[in-house]
Amino acid sequence: VDQETGKVDVTRYTAIQDAGKAIHPGYVEGQLQGGAVQGIGWALNEEYVFNKDGIMENPGFLDYRVPLASDLPMIETIIVEVPNAFHPYGVRGVGETGIIPPLAAVGYAVGNAIDRKVEELPCSPPRVLSLIKNS
């Protein structure tokens, strides 16, 4: 966390998932990485901004901030394979699960770095600066 700007950099991220039987491990890895990227985006930048009249101020890709490759660390993946006894091929869903953990992980890491409890996401620079200044 940059104490002067409030910018947060995620320097390392590891996604671990029980995929049941990973029929296509490369695809599983891609799903875990994609979910982590989306979760990191939600944790750091992504939010709808409305003006006082209720009009969205960031309705498009030019205004709605999603993470770029340069914003992200290399995302390590670890695939655990415990076959699912309730599926004929032993597989488990992995497409959605990677999205949620970054929200808690990033929020907790930011709170640790600035010695404040983070109670609202995203941890955008203005929000982080506000937490730092109000400590």
Report the location of each language-model feature:
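C-terminal catalytic domains of large/alpha subunits in multi-subunit enzymes
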Residues: 1-135
